[in-house]
Amino acid sequence: MSSNLLPTLNSGGKVKDGSTKEDRPYKIFFRDLFLVKENEMAAKETEKFMNRNMKVYQKTTFSSRMKSHSYLSQLAFYPKRSGRSFEKFGPGPAPIPRLIEGSDTKRTVHEFINDQRDRFLLEYALSTKRNTIKKFEKDIAMRERQLKKAEKKLQDDALAFEEFLRENDQRSVDALKMAAQETINKLQMTAELKKASMEVQAVKSEIAKTEFLLREYMKYGFFLLQMSPKHWQIQQALKRAQASKSKANIILPKILAKLSLHSSNKEGILEESGRTAVLSEDASQGRDSQGKPSRSLTRTPEKKKSNLAESFGSEDSLEFLLDDEMDVDLEPALYFKEPEELLQVLRELEEQNLTLFQYSQDVDENLEEVNKREKVIQDKTNSNIEFLLEQEKMLKANCVREEEKAAELQLKSKLFSFGEFNSDAQEILIDSLSKKITQVYKVCIGDAEDDGLNPIQKLVKVESRLVELCDLIESIPKENVEAIERMKQKEWRQKFRDEKMKEKQRHQQERLKAALEKAVAQPKKKLGRRLVFHSKPPSGNKQQLPLVNETKTKSQEEEYFFT
């Protein structure tokens, strides 16, 4: 079956003997697989090219060309006339004489010529079919020979491939055996490693547990050592120093130095406690003077000193003994023989802690009171600074006004010197000037020192007061002055914004009022005929409506001058 099917599938292909290589035994390449298709495409292209150069009347349709080239179109004509088909007849020249059957006995020359043409076409078609059949038979024989050669070659290749597969299977079996042996060895090694690692982990866990217990016991031992009296601790330290003679020259100086440091620290803390007690007494006295209820302290400074001295003796006992250079391998010694002794020491320490807590609370309360007083003083100073700045601005404005008045007076004096001097007017001006000077003096200094001073002396005092205020302003920190200026600017901007909003609201109310009046007013009825524009007489009196800006300026001037 394969030998019969392959020629039909690979028709038109030619295979050369020995063209395939030995490394590709399963591939057969056909050279002329698409040769018929390529020839048809080339024929179509040439036919298109020829049709482009032909005239219109020279061109033919596809159906006409097929009729002229095919004899089947001629065969389809006769069954329609006679009602018969050529399928009844077998292959060969038998259908040719039967074409005449069913035709009329009387025929024209044209019909005879057509019949002869049809006969010729049928004979030609039969001959071409015979030739093509012979050609196909030759091709089939050649392809069968080629297929036999290919089958033989395939058998040889299959034998070689089977040999290769057998060798490959043998090698894979050997490799699998080696891999299995390696995996077994690896599993044994991993099992041994796991066992060793588990043993190591167990040892490490035991070491960690023992280290934890050792730390806990050392902590408890150091705690008991800390709770023991100081003289006993010094004795134990001396014993350890004597036991380790190599380290005696290093440990004893350190112990003495630490003891001296602890004593100095105790004295400093006692001094600080005395100072804080004095501060608390001052604060309580100050509160009593201000009218607030005074608070009595629970303990005197002497009691605090004694309690602090007792507490420091037990707190500092471990620091000079917990040195890195001390030996821990010595046999431990305990001062406490019974648990009740340790509990008694702990109770005493608890009482000392309570006293210290109460003392710290007292100190915190005193600090809060001091902070409150400081805040009150700061507020007072800030208010004084603001007041002084306002006074300075007022005095500067008064000085500017007085300078302007002095310039006016100087001009008037020059006019008086040219012969226009009037003693009455001069006296009136001097009286008004003295009144203004007294007003400025009262504003700047007050009414207390107004007795028996002439205007010049008052001006001198005002000037000295201004100098003092300028010095005070310079002594004030720049940050405070800038903060006050910012506050004043903020107040001025807020005031300006409020005035602007009030003006806007008033203007809106005026507009609403005008709109309401316009809505409520009765409409004007036009009487008579309306005049034309060019015949309207000019009005004699022109009414000018006040603008909004003018009303605003007038209202601002009225507020400035009359409020």
Curated annotation (Swiss-Prot):
Coiled coil: 129-212, 384-415, 497-522
Recorded superkingdom: Eukaryota
Keyword annotations from UniProtKB, A to Z: Cell projection, Cilium, Coiled coil, Cytoplasm, Cytoskeleton, Differentiation, Flagellum, Spermatogenesis
GO MF term (any one): ubiquitin-modified histone reader activity
Bias (Polar residues): 1-11, 282-299
Basic residues: bias regions: 523-533
Protein's GO biological process: acrosome assembly; intraciliary anterograde transport; sperm flagellum assembly
Disulfides per UniProt: none
InterPro entries attached to this UniProt entry: CFAP_domain-containing, DUF4200
Subcellular location: Cytoplasm, Cytoskeleton, Microtubule organizing center, Centrosome; Cytoplasm, Perinuclear region; Cell projection, Cilium, Flagellum; Cytoplasm, Cytoskeleton
GO cellular component assignments: centrosome; manchette; perinuclear region of cytoplasm; sperm flagellum; sperm head
Signal sequence region: none
Region of interest called Disordered, as start-end residue ranges on this chain: 1-21, 272-311, 522-563
Pfam families, per the entry: DUF4200
Subunit and partners: Interacts with CCDC42, CFAP53, IFT88 and ODF2. Interacts with CCDC146. Interacts with TEKT3. Interacts with ubiquitinated histone H2A.
Described purpose of this protein according to its UniProt entry: Essential for male fertility. Required for sperm flagellum biogenesis. Also required for acrosome biogenesis. Required for the attachment of developing acrosomes to the nucleus during spermiogenesis and may be involved in the transport of fibrous sheath components.
Protein's recorded name: Coiled-coil domain-containing protein 38
Upper classification of the organism: Eukaryota, Metazoa, Chordata, Craniata, Vertebrata
